[in-house]
Amino acid sequence: MNTIAKTTWLAFLLGFSALASAGHHEGVMHDGRDIKHIGYSQMGDPAAVLTVETEASHALRPGEVRVKVLASPINPSDLLQIAGKYGVDPVLPARPGSEGVGRVTEVSDDVKALSVGQLVLLASGNTWAEELVAPAAGFLPLPDLGPVGADVIEQLAMAAVNPLTALLMLTSYADVAEGQWIAQSVANSAVGGYVI
């Protein structure tokens, strides 16, 4: 695996572990607002088990940032996990969503890597929500793109899971050198498109 692939995969894993705990803030003071997220307490047909839930928004702890979720796609893997058919079962109750894009709205005083107004990729976990509060390491900063429209936001929301899957497939599971040919099935899938 090349250095870029290792770094990207490590950032993805760090984001997953940081965001996996997002929303669990026992003993942290309420900041006066309520936020909505999607949740489920049993696995099954997503149409039957998903609910819109409301919880208190919490004040930031050291090292945390608040991110307004701008878009989060519905991936087949999300639906399979909700249905209990993914191979890895979540701890229930759970919050779905494996990727997305958001804008930083608040940072704790000790966070220097992210700033208010910055666009970030939601690396993984709990992304079907209005906002996320989690350690800064759980978000991948994007460069300043200037003003962006909804079409760009929608594309950015899908920039973590499938591109990284394609990258890892080409760098970790095959020894493909520049100029070599590969054969691929399901080339019209999202992962297939990134491989091409």
What are these regions (language model features)?
Residues 1-9:
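Bacterial N-terminal signal peptides that target proteins for export
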Residues 148-159:
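Short pre-catalytic strand/loop immediately N-terminal to key active-site residues, enriched for Gly-Thr
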Residues 15-21:
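N-terminal signal peptide c-region/cleavage motif recognized by signal peptidases
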Residues 124-138:
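A structural motif shared across PLP-dependent enzymes of the aminotransferase-like
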Residues 22-30:
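Cleaved targeting-peptide boundary
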Residues 160-196:
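Mid-domain Rossmann-like dinucleotide-binding core that forms the NAD(H)/NADP(H) cofactor-binding site
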Residues 56-73, 83-127:
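Glycine-rich beta-strand-centered segment in the early N-terminal region that forms part
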